[in-house]
Amino acid sequence: MPKASEVKKNTAIEFNNNVYLIRDIERSVPQGRSGGSLYRMRMYDVATGSKLDHTFKADEMINLADLSRHEVSFSYIDGDEYVFMDIADYTPYHFNKDSIADEILFINEETQGLQVLTVDGTPVAIELPANVELVIVETDPSIKGASASARTKPAILSTGLSVQVPEYIANGEKIKINTAEHKFMSRADSK
């Protein structure tokens, strides 16, 4: 059993006789206390989808739920459902568009390293790779000789995600995006 300070995002825990998936963690250090940090966790019930916010002390022990990870690839869209296929055994996993709205901005047919998190065989979340490669579909024209400047411009990517990119980047280029920070990392390696 890990302490609250050791728990990460997208971890499934058992709390109040239910299984919750942690979506967000905020750490705070109260002033005037000699005690440790507090961790406010936003969790969603796996069965009902209801939201729960709870604050744990840093050294409070948390029970982990039985969570499995399955490497998947994006398969197709069926109405409001996104379907992902298990790479090992071709099991389809269906997600409602609203439940993975943040992740959709980083997913296309070529995205590799996706994982579906399941609790007792039920898919509960999509875990993104650390970075993804996406194509710029709309940005201001590139400026020659601008590589030395640190100025940026907005760019819209093939999935609809908007990020700031350096001025020397042009339409049609494939770039690497950090999925945790939603930031430009570099040009993608041309293969």
Swiss-Prot record:
It holds the Pfam family Elong-fact-P_C. CDD domains: S1_EF-P_repeat_1, S1_EF-P_repeat_2. One of its GO terms (molecular function) is translation elongation factor activity. GO terms for biological process: peptide biosynthetic process. GO terms for cellular component: cytoplasm. Belongs to the elongation factor P family. NCBIfam families: PRK00529.1, PRK04542.1, yeiP. This is Elongation factor P-like protein.
